[in-house]
Amino acid sequence: MQNFGIYIIGDEILSGKRQDGHLSKVIDILSARGLQLSWAQYLGDDPAQITTALKTSFTKSDIVFSFGGIGATPDDYTRLCAAEALNVPIERHAGAVAEIVAQFGESAYPKRVFMADFPQGANLIPNPVNRVAGFSVGLKNQKHRHYFLPGLGIKFAPCGKSAMNTLLG
């Protein structure tokens, strides 16, 4: 049986400044398909902690959804940590840049465009809410099993459901 796990990343969740809505949504989406969540882990905005967790989960065959840490603020480390955990460089994805510029115009520069920097080999996960894509990655020669999505519930809904629906059918 396939295991499913989630990471929910952000100091704002751990401090109580924001409430997590991802756990219950993922459980609902999986349950509707007769599947269940195997594990969940909350992580702060600590690059070493995030990288260590990802290195561990990349070595397993679990399908993992990660929420948070892919924005453009200084505490958004998840993209960099995923690249480090995979031992690949970060590269700017032209398709993601085009979506960000289409949404934000000139205000995409200088900071929002960083949201188009993904681990080498990443696939985009379209986001119809604000056109800032999520991404999926996996170890070399493996199917992509890790899906990185926005951390705010309103942004998760279409982007996350789209990714999960594509994966789960």
State where each predicted segment sits:
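N-terminal small/polar loop signature for handling phosphorylated ligands or for N-terminal nucleophile
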Residues: 24-88, 102
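Proline/glycine-rich low-complexity loops and linkers
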Residues: 49-52, 77-169
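Extreme N-terminal starter segment of soluble prokaryotic enzymes
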Residues: 1-5
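Active-site-adjacent beta-strand anchor residues
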Residues: 16, 43, 149-150
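Glycine- and acidic-residue-enriched helix-capping/strand-helix junction motifs
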Residues: 9, 13-23
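Short glycine-rich anion-binding loops that position phosphate/pyrophosphate groups of nucleotides
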Residues: 11-12, 69-72, 151-154
